[in-house]
Amino acid sequence: MTEVQAMVEFSVELNKFYNVDLFQRGFYQIRSSMKIPSRIPHRVEASLLHATGMTLAFPASVHDSLICSKTFQILYKNEEVVLNDVMIFKVKMLLDERKIEETLEEMNFLLSLDLHFTDGDYSADDLNALQLISSRTLKLHFSPHRGLHHHVNVMFDYFHLSVVSVTVHASLVALHQPLISFPRPVKTTWLNRNAPAQNKDSVIPTLESVVFGINYTKQLSPDGCSFIIADSFLHHAYRFHYTLCATLLLAFKGLHSYFITVTEEIPSCQKLELEEMDVEARLTELCEEVKKIENPDELAELINMNLAQLCSLLMALWGQFLEVITLHEELRILLAQEHHTLRVRRFSEAFFCFEHSREAAIAYQELHAQSHLQMCTAIKNTSFCSSLPPLPIECSELDGDLNSLPIIFEDRYLDSVTEGKLDISQDDSEITQMEHNLASRRSSDDCRDHQTTPSLGARTIEIKPSNKDPFSGEKITVKLGPWTELRQEEILVDNLLPNFESLESNDEDTSSDVKSSCSSKPNLDTMCKGFQSPHKSNNSTGTAITLNSKLICLGTPCVISGSISTNTDVSEDRTMKKNSDVLNLKQMYSEIPTVESETHLGTSDPFSASTDIVKQGLVENYFGSQSSTDISDTCAVSYSNALSPQKDTSEKEISNLQQEQGKEDEEEEQDQQMVQNGYYEETDYSALDGTINAHYTSRDELMEERLIKSEKINSDYLRDGINMPTVCTSGCLSFPSAPRESPCNVKYSSKSKFDAITKQPSSTSYNFTSSISWYMSSPKPQIQAFLQAKEELKLLKLPGFMYSEVPLLASSVPYFSVEEEDGSEDGVHLIVCVHGLDGNSADLRLVKTYIELGLPGGRIDFLMSERNQNDTFADFDSMTDRLLDEIIQYIQIYSLTVSKISFIGHSLGNLIIRSVLTRPRFKYYLNKLHTFLSLSGPHLGTLYNSSALVNTGLWFMQKWKKSGSLLQLTCRDHSDPRQTFLYKLSKKAGLHYFKNVVLVGSLQDRYVPYHSARIEMCKTALKDKQSGQIYSEMIHNLLQPVLQSKDCNLVRYNVINALPNTADSLIGRAAHIAVLDSEIFLEKFFLVAALKYFQ
């Protein structure tokens, strides 16, 4: 094994320090260090690039491989401190020359950020004067070809709520023979396993042994006048030279391309004349020169000289890059936007949504809860969670991993749920009616430009009222998501176009010019170029179909329209052409996730061996040069669905589908069993034998074919850098669809609101922004594993849809974004946070933090209720009076002009909130109520708690504390159940005054019953002949006004937390408080969905 010396240089900028909610005033300092695995012989050199700005209390300093930031003093709440410390870490290491790229891709570069503090006297020379109070470790996922260019906000732990913003740039800068010795760990054996770790310095090899191999020895020629080289050593030298030169040239190309993009996209960047390099020609030239040399000494020297020249060019470019972009504010903003978008998109995985009619909210929902559990188990049995790719810079404590990410289920209750069947209309009147129906589904401003079609193949099981109980039913309506719809649409399209195999691209920008392929900013000229398919003949009818798909650029948004012409029926052609957008958008949208990104760098596949690529004559593509590339698979997916099914070509498919759907009445019993098992199987593929068997012999073969197609698409544009046409909307973020290192001009505003949350973007209102590929910066094996896992999920035919398929999520604005206040808003949005039993005002501290971070620039004021924290065992009337006094006094003392009032309650605090709403003194504020977020609130009491252990504990606590509130929770505070506190409270008006009623519960919570937190009927209550009727009446009293109010939006959540096996988890306490203290749950919940309720 031949080892070479590699050097990767990291530029780490500590931009700002934010005091989110620190408890102590004093001096703070951040210490940074870089670590890599000890099995790799390495040395780390640390330095400061240059001192900038104020020195604050003490300047930054370097201590061996440790760098200390400026020492700064924190005195005020929400204080921001500008650090602008630029730290340089040079990591020199020995790598196997056969696995340079693989090793660098897989290596864990760990950046440690330690927060130190002192409130006493401090001397800069004494490092021990400051104590370590919190630490975070960032894992940097480095690519030798693309480098690393990213920005993250690193939040320290709960007890030291503060954030430091960090920008990281990294590049490979050198590859050559080993020039220094490296400490190499000594292998331990069973004899010395307890001995302290020891290192010995590696021996510096000679140049010849590096170039020709460790076994190389000089051989004299037969005439004795010169030396000769054996073929094996010569081939080793050529391979060694090529591998290192190709890697260096690719690193140069990637850094050069990113540099060009930055300087062009950001006007304020210093413009430099950067020398263009044809890396393919340069590599060929270097290899040809080497092959001309016969003398071994001269050959080794020439190879060494070539490597030295390339390293010099790369280092010079890296120096210029740092000089221009270091501490550049506009670039930092763009990188922050990119990271935030990727992070929110990652959180949106395993966040499911189900749509129900509003009437279903009051029906018996027990089967839904069991369905959630079974879905969760099925998901965990797949590789989906374990294959979730990391972010370019990840911190498992902040971003979550397999062991910490929760699975969340959302139940929406809408006025109408689209459950139409496929219907190809034959006249304009039918299509006009369909357009009218679709228009009614266009709800919010954010979705008004996106047309939708009825979801294909959705099935309905009607709810038939039970004679025994008005709130239970024999059947349940199940809304099927786009996963199952996708496959039926693919079947139809595949049969419509059996010979539709290739699509030539006329896009002039499919070259490797990284300036265009990196840029995320949509180029309207490029987007408007046409894509035309060759004429293909349909085997069944002989009908020639011409697809003229073009991008119609009307500012933003842009939509793809397909015009279809046939040579059989002119009138039908006119009808289909006229309504092609309406009929096709759903099909196109449901296919788009397969093509995961529109634009990518024209760089090589990071795991492709450069030697093999050159031998195959693919150097052109490897370096991203312009090439003629077959994109048939890519276009077959993106454009085949733009073709509307026509009567002439798809009559058989339509009839089969309608025949299958006509069997619903015969299959009701099977359907009921499916729902009870937690799944709802859509139309089976066997029902479409006539259409499937034309291409595939089995379902397995069909799914395998789709998976291969999906993987091939991703590998094609990863390797060739094809510029797929980009489609943007006004709410589209440019970064996710572009390479992660490509900045662009991004405009955003936290003031965007959902005028009616009840009409949220659903699975049917799909958009091209849903093809955001947050994981495309990951190594190819991780991408393939994740795509495989997503295919496994599709095979499960899970109901509903995932938020990762929704184009617009709740948060699009990075934390700490500075925005102008919206002067049109009068007054502040007051959010009152109320703790639960035996709690205090700090219980909802994290909830407050993530709302504030997620809505920067918003006029929000928080009242963290503390009036009841000394006595939460009192009766509810007493606690209600205290909270009401606290709210009114807070508004009066601070002279607040309140435009909105929202309440967030935990556990018992939710009942105090509801009680406040009924008081006459609060009547003035009822018309200002906005959102009620209930976190594990016992709205129906604890009457049917399934945990005997918890019931016993609460009974003991009630007796011990003589607690009125605990007695009232059990509905035993009066002999007449209809005179109990909870029943009388349910009769009083309250919840329907809110715009949003959000109920969060968990099946893992044993303290508050799941059905009580979500205000649902439970099986035990149905069987209880004494109190069950009272329970049903309470549910009806609470929900009926909410459902009757058109302005009130009801949403329920079920949270399945990833909890450790502890006593708290066993008794259900861990899940009960996870809604308060789990940073990962709160960020996922608010960033993906819940922030919109507070906008």
UniProtKB/Swiss-Prot annotation:
Keyword Calcium in record: no
Coiled-coil region: 269-295, 646-670
UniProtKB keywords: Coiled coil
Gene3D superfamilies xrefs: alpha/beta hydrolase
Superkingdom assignment: Eukaryota
Gene behind this protein: FAM135A
InterPro entries attached to this UniProt entry: AB_hydrolase_fold, DUF3657, DUF676_lipase-like, Lipase-like
This protein's name: Protein FAM135A
Phylogenetic lineage: Eukaryota, Metazoa, Chordata, Craniata, Vertebrata
One Pfam family cited in the UniProt record for this chain: DUF3657
Family: Belongs to the FAM135 family.
Chain intervals for the UniProt region annotation (Disordered): 643-673
Keyword Coiled coil part of the UniProt annotation: yes
